Regions:
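Feature marking well-ordered beta-strand scaffolds used for ligand recognition
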Residues: 1-371
């Protein structure tokens, strides 16, 4: 039976699990985790009664678990499924669709990358900020694509961690610190980049053709988990500029308690400083299997209450109005989907109206609101 505090369910959609959910207008777009399920589109004009209007299947051996929609364009990643092992016949990249009629998505192009493909990205309707594997580079790097002509995306610029450009004579610092670009969020002329075990990175993209490093913060290997998402708050909190930094509860360097969330002061963006953390009470000293702890926050927030997808422990609502002492003010832990051993809350999208669209990576979409 589901458990909730401070949140209540508006509706539930029994649908194949997903990696990301995004809302644009009256439509919900779900990028699924596993083939043959690719991307589903739901009419949510009545959030109490969502209706599926389209589905795009994919072939076996492909992973399209991320989706973004802006300006009637839908962008979907195309990569080799985990553990990202593939032969030379695999073609990774990114798909672009026209969704001016969401019930009839029309493919516009398939942008090709080398290697395993594109993992995650941000998209503002013109530019895509992607994390592709690229010929001559060790694992994924940061890249900016211009979709002015969505049938022919063009690279504008790229950035990589020193050591990744093996074709240029650099040597990757592998060891236990897997260095690759995991996720990017754009805010103004800055990119906030999660670089896995290499930490968080802030890039200046005033000149998009030449992204420049502003700063970097790394706390691995001292802490066992990789950095998943860097979300700058859209307003000052207690007079300071704050970033919500989520570690992901996977690929940990050693047995440890589940991953947690950091609050990082970026008032001086050249010197980001961690000032607090949030962990679910009672988990601080418990060694647990992967996919138990923190995953990622909603990437659009409108108050100090941050919805965070927390894998086995559902959705946690964390108030950061005191950035030195974040406090849980609500939670929703769904029922375990049939055929699985625990919930796996993977992603959440928060609307301006306060609805939270919460997708389980195995099965089910819950639409929630504050109680």
């Amino acid at each position: 039976m589901s458990q909730a505090k401070g949140l209540k369910e508006v509706s539930y959609v029994d649908i194949i699990g997903g990696g990301q959910v995004t809302i644009q207008g009256n439509y919900c777009y779900i990028a699924h985790m596993d083939a043959p399920a690719g991307t589903s589109i739901l009419d949510i004009s009545d959030p109490k009664h969502p209706k599926q209007v389209a589905h795009i299947p994919i072939p076996a051996g492909v992973h399209t678990h991320k989706v973004r929609v802006e300006n009637d364009l839908m962008v979907v990643n195309w990569e080799c499924p985990p553990p990202y092992i593939h032969d030379d016949s695999f073609q990774g990249g990114m798909l672009v669709y026209d969704v001016s009629n969401p019930a009839k998505p029309k493919e516009l192009c398939f942008w090709k990358s080398a290697g395993a493909g594109v993992h995650r990205f941000d998209f503002d309707g013109r530019y895509a900020y992607i994390t592709p594997t690229v010929e001559g580079y060790h694992l994924n790097i940061a890249m900016i694509l211009d979709l002015k002509d969505p049938t022919k995306p063009e690279e504008v610029g790229r950035w990589w961690m020193p050591g990744q450009h093996v074709a240029g004579g650099e040597t990757p610092d592998e060891g236990y610190r897997l260095t690759w670009c995991h996720h990017i969020l754009r805010r103004g002329n800055r990119l906030y980049v999660a670089y896995w075990h290499a930490g968080m990175v802030i890039l200046d993209i005033e000149d998009m053709s030449k992204p420049k490093l502003v700063s970097r913060l790394q706390y691995s290997p001292a802490f066992a988990h990789p950095t998943h998402t860097v979300l700058p708050m859209p307003f000052e909190v207690a007079g300071r500029k704050i970033a919500i930094v989520a570690d992901e509860d996977v690929r940990k360097l050693r047995p440890s308690p589940p991953a947690f969330m950091w609050l990082v002061d970026i008032t001086d963006e050249k010197q980001p400083v961690p000032i607090s953390t949030y962990q679910i009470e009672g988990l601080e000293n418990r060694n647990m299997p992967e996919f138990s702890g923190c995953h990622e926050p909603a990437e659009q927030v409108y108050s100090t209450e941050i919805p965070v997808a927390w894998f086995e422990f559902g959705l946690r609502l964390v108030d950061v109005k005191n950035p030195h002492a974040p406090k849980e003010v609500g939670y929703f832990v769904p029922d375990t989907p049939s055929g699985f051993d625990r919930p796996q809350t993977n992603d959440v999208f928060l609307t301006k109206e306060g609805l939270m669209y919460v997708i389980d990576r195995n099965r089910g979409l819950h639409i929630l609101e504050r109680a």
